[in-house]
């Protein structure tokens, strides 16, 4: 069997563009958030998406206990916020850098997000170092900004909606 080494895998994955998201939670275990691009649709019946979270991440226990989350998809210009939530900055400083409102699950929704998906974690599957969080979507909030933000080739890229 041919096993692909970690660096080859990571280099190949850098060729797959993905939306940039800040995943947030709030509940009995506290408030937390992190930046993620490992997010995708699972099905529209019932509306479900998935988020991949490293079990070694400092935020993992908070998400594991709260069982709710909000996927906040960023728009162009929000790169500094992505970097803030992707680093070791204390949680209170991360959340102080933007305006938030509580979603139906109580999770923080970024007011200027391109779109926010307010979810309850319905199932968790462990694979390697990560948990795959299957998330039942309870509410969606869209913002009118025309610019998306993707992570591709290890850097940010702005996308604009077509005029037609």
Swiss-Prot record:
Q: Might you give the EC number(s) for this enzyme?
A: 1.5.1.42
Q: What UniProt keywords apply to this chain's record, in alphabetical order? A: Flavoprotein, FMN, NAD, Oxidoreductase
On the tree of life, the source organism's domain of life is Bacteria
GO terms, molecular function: FMN binding; FMN reductase (NADH) activity; FMN reductase [NAD(P)H] activity; riboflavin reductase (NADPH) activity
**Annotated catalysed reactions:** FMNH2 + NAD(+) = FMN + NADH + 2 H(+)
Record-linked InterPro entries? Flavin_Rdtase-like_dom, NADH-dep_flavin_reductase, RutF, Split_barrel_FMN-bd
SUPFAM superfamilies, per this entry?
Answer: FMN-binding split barrel
- Residue span of the signal peptide, if any? none
Up-regulation conditions = Up-regulated by the nitrogen regulatory protein C (NtrC also called GlnG) and repressed by RutR.
Q: Which PANTHER family match?
A: FLAVIN REDUCTASE, FMN REDUCTASE (NADH) RUTF
What the record says about family reads: Belongs to the non-flavoprotein flavin reductase family. RutF subfamily.
User: Could you tell me which HAMAP family the record lists for this protein?
Assistant: RutF
Functional summary from the UniProt entry: Catalyzes the reduction of FMN to FMNH2 which is used to reduce pyrimidine by RutA via the Rut pathway.
Annotated protein name in UniProt: FMN reductase (NADH) RutF
List the source organism: Escherichia coli O157:H7
Give the lineage: Bacteria, Pseudomonadati, Pseudomonadota, Gammaproteobacteria, Enterobacterales
């Amino acid at each position: 069997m041919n096993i692909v080494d970690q660096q080859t895998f990571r280099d190949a994955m850098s060729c797959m563009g993905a939306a940039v998201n800040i995943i947030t939670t709030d509940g009995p275990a506290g408030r937390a958030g992190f930046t993620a691009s490992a997010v995708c649709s699972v099905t529209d019946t019932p509306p479900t998406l998935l988020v991949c979270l490293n079990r070694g991440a400092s935020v993992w226990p908070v998400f594991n206990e709260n069982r709710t989350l909000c996927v906040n998809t960023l728009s162009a210009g929000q790169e500094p916020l992505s970097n803030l939530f992707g680093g070791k900055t204390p949680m209170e400083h991360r959340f102080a850098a933007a305006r938030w409102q509580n979603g139906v699950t109580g999770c923080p929704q970024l007011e200027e997000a391109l779109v926010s998906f307010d979810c309850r974690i319905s199932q968790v599957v462990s694979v390697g170092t990560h948990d795959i969080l299957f998330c039942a979507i309870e509410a969606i909030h869209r913002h009118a900004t025309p610019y998306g933000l993707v992570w591709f080739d290890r850097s940010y890229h702005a996308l604009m909606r077509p005029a037609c």
